[in-house]
């Protein structure tokens, strides 16, 4: 049963990929959706047995690599962390598959799309169930490859090509850091198995590595692993690929942002909690990185006009919350927020897809407006998703995001206070752009063409069913799962997560945090909604004052251009590498040394040599006789010199033999 959870999506992908032309669009969609749905049902059974029954399952399938000290095998671990991730991945993926049946029905390449979607789903369970770093890395690279294929699905669009290449290249930076971290783990622990590494994590706390500076070994490994998480989970510095990934079909965006690729980094940090707990420096770096990411993405999202990009930046911001929750050693709350976030983020993306699908692929919110009367169901779904996103009381997002902020405050450290205040300000911006999206899309007077309004329609039944199920999750999952997963005294994560006793602050955040600290997120959410209402729906004079202010214009330009991250990376890194590639790789090597030492140089040398030799053919006999005499003289001279040298070598060998024999006789007499 456990193996079927992992390999059923692979079966569906293989059938759709190899036999899609015979099954057709409907047959491929039914096959892939059925396989992923059965995987989701089996994940629920595994959750009951493993998480609720408190009985982890470990499977060793077969040896994989065995080379002297390096030994890796195919193995799967099913603990509470794994089964929670499996439910999130398979349940969201099954709904996305069902949604895609209607959304992609008119696309001629629908079987290929369903094949890619299922292979994407397969690699994520492979990542979360692996019992060693090597298997995790296989799933890690697999989701990167599948995301490239899905973002690049409409390959005739230039922007889709550029976005897919950008996602692949930016993630290569993080993947390189992860690979170095795995290599460091093997160097330090002589294994890549999680169980062995985590059991020995406390032993090398005082091990040091000298590379022009003295570095703690565990800290270095954790920083390298963090680089991998920064790339995959779109944290500050390597976050630029995530908004551009919106060039793929909307179901792809929902799957990437809600359940698969971007959650891999958070999962990896939670899985490696026994390592990170013994590196306070790495935890501080994680906290600062997550807090800055949440603030950066929130401030960027308030000025985006693309419907999907606004939701994409909200994903980036929420990932920042998950990362800095890991930085303050609350991995359980981070994973809980990951699970809650999956429901309302998938709901937001699929609701946006319903609008885009009905509006003939229009994504600019400024060209919409007044759609609440035409899309009452979609409007209700997006309203519920937005309220859950901002942490509206008693909805799913409220039970995890507010807890993260309270924990950051009661950490009572500089990094904790930094994360709390930046996270709280990010709540204000999150509320602002969430309500701005609702106002510009559904409530302001319409800016669409009349023909578009007349022919638009609400979500059909196959697209509405996933929205209803996700809406129920966005309303009730947080309330139902809070006490089980992050309640005081729960042992839900006992077999998967590790926290040092000195870092346990959940009880303190529950009882010692001041009431005003608990109310700050709600107050900021209300303020953000009020500002969005006044700026976008009521007060035109505020917009005019904003446009005439020099400072506001510069601030607008700064946020609208994404803090100039793309420009800085292009000017200082991309162009430098392209220039280096042209001047060194192309001109100096390809067209220089390789050509000279390679085919061009060899052919030129032999051609010139042949021309020189051909000039010796003068036609005079005495020239040939002189050449023969010269050659014979050189031949005889060489052999005479060789005979003299060889005789000298032979005489020296004889002398050594005589002396050694005399020495042996003398030794025997003594």
Curated annotation (Swiss-Prot):
The protein's Enzyme Commission number: 7.1.1.2
Top EC class for this record: translocase
GO molecular function, one term: NADH dehydrogenase (ubiquinone) activity
InterPro entries assigned to the protein according to its UniProt record, in alphabetical order: NADH_DH_su5_C, NADHpl_OxRdtase_5_subgr, ND/Mrp_TM, NU5C-like, Proton_antipo_N
Keywords in alphabetical order: Electron transport, Membrane, Mitochondrion, Mitochondrion inner membrane, NAD, Respiratory chain, Translocase, Transmembrane, Transmembrane helix, Transport, Ubiquinone
GO biological process: ATP synthesis coupled electron transport; electron transport coupled proton transport
Transmembrane portions of the chain: 3-23, 36-56, 76-96, 113-133, 136-156, 218-238, 250-270, 283-303, 319-339, 340-360, 375-395, 418-438, 461-481, 619-639
Pfam family, one: Proton_antipo_N
Gene Ontology annotations for the cellular component aspect, listed alphabetically: mitochondrial inner membrane; plastid
Bilayer topology term: Multi-pass membrane protein
Compartmental location: Mitochondrion inner membrane
Catalytic activity: a ubiquinone + NADH + 5 H(+)(in) = a ubiquinol + NAD(+) + 4 H(+)(out)
Top-rank lineage group of the source organism: Eukaryota
Function noted in UniProt: Core subunit of the mitochondrial membrane respiratory chain NADH dehydrogenase (Complex I) that is believed to belong to the minimal assembly required for catalysis. Complex I functions in the transfer of electrons from NADH to the respiratory chain. The immediate electron acceptor for the enzyme is believed to be ubiquinone.
Protein family: Belongs to the complex I subunit 5 family.
Miscellaneous comment text of the record: Exons a and b and d and e are cis-spliced, while trans-splicing reactions are required to link exons b and c and c and d.
Subunit structure: Complex I is composed of about 30 different subunits.
Protein name (record): NADH-ubiquinone oxidoreductase chain 5
Lineage: Eukaryota, Viridiplantae, Streptophyta, Embryophyta, Tracheophyta
């Amino acid at each position: 049963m456990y193996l079927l959870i992992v390999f059923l999506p692979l079966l569906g992908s293989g059938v759709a990929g190899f036999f899609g032309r015979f099954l057709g669009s409907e047959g491929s969609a039914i096959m892939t959706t059925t396989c992923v749905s059965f995987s989701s049902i089996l994940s629920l059974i595994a959750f009951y047995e493993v998480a609720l029954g408190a009985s982890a399952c470990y499977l060793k399938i077969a040896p994989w690599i065995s080379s002297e000290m390096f030994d890796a095998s195919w193995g799967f671990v099913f603990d509470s962390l794994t089964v929670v991730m499996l439910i999130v991945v398979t349940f969201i993926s099954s709904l996305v598959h069902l949604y895609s049946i209607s959304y992609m029905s008119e696309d001629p390449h629908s079987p290929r799309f369903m094949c890619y979607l299922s292979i994407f789903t397969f690699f994520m369970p492979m990542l979360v169930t692996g019992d060693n770093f090597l298997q995790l890395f296989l799933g890690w690279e697999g989701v990167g490859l599948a995301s490239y294929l899905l973002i690049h699905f409409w390959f005739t669009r230039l922007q889709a090509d550029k976005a897919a290449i950008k996602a692949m290249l930016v993630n290569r930076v993080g993947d390189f850091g992860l690979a170095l971290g795995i290599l460091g783990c093997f160097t330090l622990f002589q294994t890549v198995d999680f169980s062995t590494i985590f059991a020995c994590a406390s032993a090398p706390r005082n091990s040091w590595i000298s590379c022009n500076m003295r570095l703690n070994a565990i800290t270095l490994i954790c920083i390298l692993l963090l680089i991998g998480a920064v790339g995959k989970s779109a944290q500050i510095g390597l976050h630029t690929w995530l908004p551009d990934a919106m060039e793929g079909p909307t179901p792809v965006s929902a799957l990437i942002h809600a359940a698969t690729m971007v959650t891999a980094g958070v999962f990896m940090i939670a899985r490696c909690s026994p390592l990170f707990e013994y590196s306070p420096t790495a935890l501080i770096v994680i906290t600062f990185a997550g807090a800055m990411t949440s603030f950066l993405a929130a401030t960027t999202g308030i000025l985006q006009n693309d419907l999907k990009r606004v939701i994409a930046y909200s994903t980036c911001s929420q990932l920042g919350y998950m990362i800095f929750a890991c930085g303050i050693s609350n991995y359980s709350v981070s994973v809980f927020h990951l699970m809650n976030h999956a429901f309302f983020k998938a709901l937001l993306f699929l609701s946006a897809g319903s609008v885009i699908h009905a509006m003939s692929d229009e994504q600019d919110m400024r060209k919409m407006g007044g759609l609440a009367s035409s899309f009452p169901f979609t409007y209700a779904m997006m309203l519920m998703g937005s309220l859950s996103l901002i942490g509206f009381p008693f909805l799913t997002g409220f039970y995890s995001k507010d807890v993260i902020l309270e924990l950051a405050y009661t950490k009572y450290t500089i990094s904790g206070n930094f994360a709390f205040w930046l996270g709280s300000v990010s709540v204000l911006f999150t509320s602002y752009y969430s309500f701005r999206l609702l106002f510009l899309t559904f409530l302001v007077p319409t800016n669409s063409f009349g023909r578009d309004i007349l022919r638009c329609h609400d979500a059909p039944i196959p697209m509405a069913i996933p929205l209803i199920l996700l809406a129920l999750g966005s309303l009730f999952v947080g309330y139902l799962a809070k006490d089980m997963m992050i309640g005081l005294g729960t042992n839900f994560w006992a077999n998967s997560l590790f926290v040092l006793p000195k870092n346990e602050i959940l009880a303190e955040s529950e009882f010692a945090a001041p009431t005003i600290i608990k109310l700050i997120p709600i107050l900021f959410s209300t303020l953000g909604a009020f500002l969005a209402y006044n700026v976008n729906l009521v007060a035109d004079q505020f917009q005019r004052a904003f446009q005439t202010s020099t400072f506001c214009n510069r601030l607008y330009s700064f946020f609208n251009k994404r803090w100039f991250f793309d420009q800085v990376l292009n000017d200082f890194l991309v162009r430098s590498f392209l220039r280096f590639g042209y001047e060194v790789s192309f001109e100096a090597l390809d067209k220089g040394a390789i050509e000279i030492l390679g085919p061009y140089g060899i052919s030129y040398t032999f051609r010139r040599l042949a021309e020189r030799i051909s000039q010796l053919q003068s036609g005079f006999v005495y020239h040939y006789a002189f050449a023969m005499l010269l050659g014979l003289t050189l031949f005889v001279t060489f052999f005479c010199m060789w005979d003299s040298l060889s005789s000298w070598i032979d005489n020296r060998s004889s002398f050594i033999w005589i002396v050694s024999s005399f020495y042996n006789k003398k030794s025997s007499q003594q």
